[in-house]
């Protein structure tokens, strides 16, 4: 994967100058942040924090939206789902102040595995509300392929939602760890590859979503790189390593090892 730009997951935005010092020392150029900072601070604070990071050579490239039953875009409970939509809408607006390119959203949780078909419909309805906001703010939504027993496990399920909503602000966040747990990483990739707008690179044992740093699990990275190269439009943006560094190492080592795959 030589030549691919890598982002890392990092926090510490409450003290942006320290974050810049720490990240720059490790050779980090871009990060994925979690949503809490954006949802609990003012637009002015978000703007100023992003400016400090940008001046220090660090881009907040993506933000992971809240997830879990209480934040599910496909929650069976209509009130919970409405609140989840509002939270995602607020996040889109806040991320726009920081120049964030994409938020990562889960289609849903495993709270009702016997109702996945209905949950896909509810997720579609939620995204129909969010897509105009994403278009207006110019912050895209990357819908993540999920673990077994979740809506969005297969590539076909993701495309069903994206095709129905039909917005240029929506795409796929391809998660290698989730696809590996489903037993067919290449198959999922082949289905969604023309709709991928961002990546989560992670490794595991093929059973649990362990978030090991690549390549310390059982993902076939040679196979992944091979299928990655079949994308019709060459992917030139950052790919996020959604794991901590392997114990004993730092971000510089993580970036070096993943780049060498």
Q: What is the predicted function of each stretch?
A:
Residues 32, 62, 104, 142, ...:
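Conserved beta-strand positions in the central sheet of alpha/beta enzyme cores
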Residues 69-75, 109-116, 181-182, 207-212:
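A short acidic, helix-capping loop that chelates divalent metal ions and anchors anionic groups
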Residues 43-46, 73-75, 115-118, 154-156, ...:
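Short secondary-structure transition/capping segments
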Residues 9-13, 34-38, 65-68, 108-110, ...:
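Active-site beta-loop-alpha junctions enriched in small/polar residues
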Residues 20-26, 41-63, 90-99, 128-136, ...:
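Acidic (Asp/Glu)-rich catalytic clusters
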Residues 1-97, 258-260:
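N-terminal pre-domain/capping segments
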Residues 1-5, 13-27, 152-261:
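Histidine-acidic metal/acid-base catalytic patches
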Residues 14-18, 55, 74-171:
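Active-site acidic/histidine proton-transfer and metal-coordination neighborhood
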């Amino acid at each position: 994967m030589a030549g691919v730009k890598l982002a890392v997951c990092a926090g510490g935005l409450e003290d942006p100058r320290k974050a810049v010092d720490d990240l720059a020392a490790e050779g980090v150029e871009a990060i994925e942040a979690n949503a809490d900072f954006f949802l609990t601070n003012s637009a002015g604070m978000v703007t100023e924090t992003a400016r400090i990071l940008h001046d220090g050579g660090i881009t907040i490239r993506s933000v992971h939206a809240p997830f879990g039953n209480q934040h599910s875009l496909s929650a069976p409970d209509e009130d919970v789902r409405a609140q989840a939509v509002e939270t995602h809408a607020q996040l889109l607006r806040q991320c726009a102040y920081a120049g964030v390119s994409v938020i990562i959203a889960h289609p849903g949780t495993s709270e009702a595995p016997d109702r996945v078909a209905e949950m896909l419909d509810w997720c579609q309805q939620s995204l129909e509300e969010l897509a105009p906001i994403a278009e207006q703010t110019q912050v895209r939504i990357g819908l993540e392929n999920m673990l077994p027993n979740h809506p969005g496990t297969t590539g076909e399920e993701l495309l069903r939602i994206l095709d129905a909503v039909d917005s240029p602000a929506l795409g796929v966040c391809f998660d290698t760890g989730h696809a590996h747990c489903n037993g067919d990483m290449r198959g999922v990739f082949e289905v969604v590859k023309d709709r991928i707008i961002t990546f989560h690179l992670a490794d595991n044992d093929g059973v649990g979503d362990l978030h090991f740093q690549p390549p310390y699990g059982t993902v076939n990275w040679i196979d992944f790189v091979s299928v990655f190269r079949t994308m019709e439009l060459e992917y030139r943006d950052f790919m996020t390593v959604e794991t901590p560094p392997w114990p004993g190492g730092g971000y510089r080592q993580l970036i070096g090892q993943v780049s060498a795959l």
